[in-house]
Every structure is written in structure tokens, then in C-alpha cells.
Amino acid sequence: MRPGRPLAGFYATLRRSFRRMSKRSKNKAKKERVPVEDRPPTPMPTSQRLIRRNALGGGVRPDAEDCIQRCHPLEPALGVSTKNFDLLSLRCELGWCG
């Protein structure tokens, strides 16, 4: 940095980032964007399906797994945390859900 210009590096970085941002207009970006409503829900990764542990400490029983897939298909896709998923699988294990 040169003396007398303590913010020269900051301004250079700012200029570079503005140059990068201005390559595509906001309206063009909006037109290219895929609306969320049109997209199908993200399926839960198969690797997480049966290996998740429930609150009882074991793997989810197959009938509870069916219940989770049948009655709560979107909940894992919407970002349910491991703790909430454990409670959900326990609810299905004990037959407390619909």
C-alpha cells in the first residue's frame, strides 16, 4: 500500500467485484432462474434412509421406514435435522403417527 492511500487495496478489490457482478444483469439472472415451485422436491439421499438411527438407538424398522416414506416423504427433503428425524422415526416406531 502506498502512503496516503490506506484504502487503495480495498477499493481495488471492490472495483474487481463490481466488474464481476456487472457481467450479468439482475433481470437476466431472474429470467434464467428456475422457480422453486416448478422443481420437484429433493429426494432424501438413499444412503441416509436406512442408516439413520432412531431415538431408540437402533436402525429404523422396515415397517417404520415404510411409514416414513409413505406419510412423511417431504420432511427429510425439507432439511429435517438428525434430531428431528430421530423423533420422527421414533414416532413411527411406536405407531403414534397417522
Curated annotation (Swiss-Prot):
Family of this protein: Belongs to the lymphocryptovirus BNLF2B family.
Region spans: Disordered: 19-47
Biased composition (Basic residues): 19-31
Organism encoding this protein: Epstein-Barr virus (strain AG876) (HHV-4)
Name the record gives this protein: Uncharacterized protein BNLF2b
Highest taxon, organism lineage: Viruses
Lineage, uppermost ranks: Viruses, Duplodnaviria, Heunggongvirae, Peploviricota, Herviviricetes
